[in-house]
């Protein structure tokens, strides 16, 4: 029996670096609409919803024909928002957390992460990575690195350079912020003790690693552009013009 898969796009208005980011315009559409429409091209999602704590985002999504659910404004992380939504949609066995600040997200990335989780019920989660070819990016603390074992499972995530390249040059991989969760694991995630590694690296997924849960890695060919600041938005706008998605 095919597992039912729910895609969730968390969207906050009150971003410290870019307030109102989901409603920023790229051509004639908001960023959240671009993200939603591109994510909806996935071939494996049974349903796609935006999860937001802001009525302005909620109304915009409904206006362009998307599905949106209102969530609490007290969540300390995007994962907590996903958990609230998972509790509302009990019929789905896999929940995919899709970042709302990647308006050009490729549906193949969503399909890869979701399908990997569906084919490995023994893993609690799946996520994605991309080969890291620029060494300046490898030593950038804002770009999370991951080491992958021979079975395609994550060994460790870090903001530091891993592996160290001390004696031999080996491939490096950058983590991409998309997650496929086993529903039962997701609902008990907050009951896991906070990890020292999680606190040290400021990476939530290390809570699962330290508790002994498996995280599968889907290898993508390239990373999409994400928007953290208004300057990032301008880069995305230029990229969309090159793709002919918006006019000059």
UniProtKB/Swiss-Prot annotation:
It is found in: Cytoplasm. CDD domains: CMP-KDO-Synthetase (cd02517). InterPro entries: Cytidylyl_trans, KdsB, Nucleotide-diphossugar_trans. One of its GO terms (cellular component) is cytosol. Its EC number is 2.7.7.38. Pathway: Nucleotide-sugar biosynthesis; CMP-3-deoxy-D-manno-octulosonate biosynthesis; CMP-3-deoxy-D-manno-octulosonate from 3-deoxy-D-manno-octulosonate and CTP: step 1/1; Bacterial outer membrane biogenesis; lipopolysaccharide biosynthesis. GO terms for biological process: CMP-keto-3-deoxy-D-manno-octulosonic acid biosynthetic process; lipopolysaccharide biosynthetic process. Gene3D superfamilies: Spore Coat Polysaccharide Biosynthesis Protein SpsA, Chain A (3.90.550.10). Keywords: Cytoplasm, Lipopolysaccharide biosynthesis, Nucleotidyltransferase, Transferase. It catalyses: 3-deoxy-alpha-D-manno-oct-2-ulosonate + CTP = CMP-3-deoxy-beta-D-manno-octulosonate + diphosphate. Pfam families: CTP_transf_3. GO terms for molecular function: 3-deoxy-manno-octulosonate cytidylyltransferase activity. Activates KDO (a required 8-carbon sugar) for incorporation into bacterial lipopolysaccharide in Gram-negative bacteria. Belongs to the KdsB family. This is 3-deoxy-manno-octulosonate cytidylyltransferase. The gene is kdsB.
């Amino acid at each position: 029996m095919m597992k039912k898969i729910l895609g969730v796009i968390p969207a906050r208005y009150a971003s410290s670096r870019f307030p109102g980011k989901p409603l920023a315009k790229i051509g004639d559409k908001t960023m959240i609409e671009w993200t939603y429409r591109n994510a909806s091209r996935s071939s494996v999602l049974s349903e796609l919803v935006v999860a937001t704590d802001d009525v302005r985002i909620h109304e915009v999504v409904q206006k362009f024909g998307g599905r949106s659910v209102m969530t609490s404004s007290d969540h300390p992380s995007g994962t907590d928002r996903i958990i609230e939504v998972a509790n509302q949609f009990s019929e789905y066995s896999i929940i995919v957390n899709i970042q709302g600040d990647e308006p050009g997200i490729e549906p193949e990335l969503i399909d890869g992460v979701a399908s990997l989780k569906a084919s490995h019920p023994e893993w609690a989660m799946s996520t994605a990575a991309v080969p890291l070819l620029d060494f300046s990016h490898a030593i950038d603390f804002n770009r999370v690195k991951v080491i992958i074992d021979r079975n395609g499972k994550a060994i460790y995530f870090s903001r530091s350079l891993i592996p160290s390249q001390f004696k031999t040059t080996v491939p490096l991989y950058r983590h991409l912020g998309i997650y496929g969760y086993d529903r039962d694991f997701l609902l008990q995630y907050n009951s896991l003790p906070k990890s020292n590694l999680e606190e040290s690296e400021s990476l939530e997924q290390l809570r699962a690693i330290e508790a002994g849960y498996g995280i599968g890695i889907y290898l993508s060919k390239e990373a999409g552009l994400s928007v953290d600041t208004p300057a990032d938005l301008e880069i995305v706008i230029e990229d969309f013009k090159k793709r002919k998605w918006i006019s000059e």
